[in-house]
Amino acid sequence: MQAVRCHGPHELKVEDIEGPGMAPGAGEVSVRIERGGICGSDLHYYHDGGFGTVRIKEPLTLGHEVSGVVAAVGAGVKRVAAGDRVAVNPSRACGTCRYCQRGEQVHCLDMRFFGSAMRFPHVQGAFSEQVLVDEAQCFKVLGSLTAGEAAMAEPLAVCLHAVNQAGPLVGAKVLVTGSGPIGVLCAAAARRAGATEIVATDVAPLPLKTMERIGADAVIDIAAQPDALKGFSQDKGTFDVVFEASGREAALVGALDAIRPGGRIVQVGIGGDMKLPMTQIVAKEISIRGTFRFHEEFGTAVDMMNKGLIDVSPRISQTLPFRQALAAFDLASDRSTAMKVQLAFS
């Protein structure tokens, strides 16, 4: 079978691989992949060969935002059957370490996450024609939900976890800085959680247009209007919660004037270390929380999409055949023309 593999910076190839035996063992499921979304981490591997201190040391099959059809199931599998459409959770916690035992699987000491070079040998990803996964990683897709929409379960789960980190949002005024796929989904999840006012910022027009489509109350092009947030800084600030989805120090620092005393900042984007004005943070009693991946939120994401509670379709901008992966990755790298680019495997 064929897969999309990264060998190093700008060394992306569609090539034949020897996958594990596709006859599933006990508790395993073989899934024929239909759609796969290109994530920011995939782009880091493509452009830089990794991120931070993590570097590709062997060919790495990319991809962790995928959906497909069950090809076969192993002995004892009950939650899915051959022919079922599924979203595949890329996260496989060990279940036995102290964090898993405390219900904090996101911090698992032996985590295996699709398409990751954080451990060696690397954990291969799901941008391949077929994958073998544990039964617990499969979530049924129902009704008219498309394969592309089902593949958005992973980024939606990331944002649902971020919303859980934010605390109560009923009646909240929310600022989202960075309106890429994650920022847009954070806005949608915040609205579903009860936020009554959502303002979004970005430096590119396309993401802001998508924010408008999903119902943001106001959008601000910070590149064109660098002082536009100052209007929200009166009386010590306006927003109850900030979702910082850009990973940019300037975005986080700029939000501090606009957040009210006692407000909560959830740092979603990862862009490296930042220098923060601690005096302002202390004086305004601002809480800053990190958010990383997800666990139970993946099942919630699929359930919400199955029930039509969140429409992820506006975030999908282009779909290309997986054999055109190089063109797809270049397209996904251009924020002026693309939001979420997906690969079609069927």
Tell what function each PLM region has.
Residues I259-R260:
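Helix-to-beta-strand junctions that scaffold the AdoMet/dcAdoMet cofactor pocket
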Residues M1-A3, V253-L256, H295, G299-S346:
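C-terminal hydrophobic helical "lid"/dimerization subdomain
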